[in-house]
Amino acid sequence: IFAEDEFPPNSGIYIRDLGPDVLLRSVAIAYRGAKSVVASPKVRKTPGSFSQSVRVGDWLLLAGQDAVGFNRQVEAEGDLAGQTEVTLQHTMDILEEAGGTLDDIVKTTVYLVAGQDRSKFAAAYRKFFNRYSRSSRMPAGLTVEVRELSPRCLVEIDAVAYLGD
């Protein structure tokens, strides 16, 4: 149904309690116009069935990024602030490949492993945006606590960006 390099962006997250008798919850965004896959050579291509990002019109939908590098090792292992910075750098690299900047992000969804100090994440997140963003505007966001992510990863972030005028 999808060409090998044209899978939709995706974040694979385990959430323990979706509700009574709920086994799966899925959200899909459909678009009938032209779509293009955008991938940065600076970011590791994850084996599997999703793209780093997909551009639909002026919108860029970015798959969840984490702190795993090209060597398949987690960068800043055990350090939530460090992993947040690496994860946001991956996100920014993909945005730049699409011609965007951090200022174009309108929403992020953050997945934090349970038991992490959210204030450390929030401080690293704000610091990164303050350093690389031209505006003081932060994107809308949602933070979800999860039981686990990729092995040794403490944070994963997916994003939606608007690249229009």
Outline where the language-model segments fall.
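N-terminal presequence-like segments and the immediate start of the first folded domain
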Residues: I1-Q89, D93-K107, L112-D165
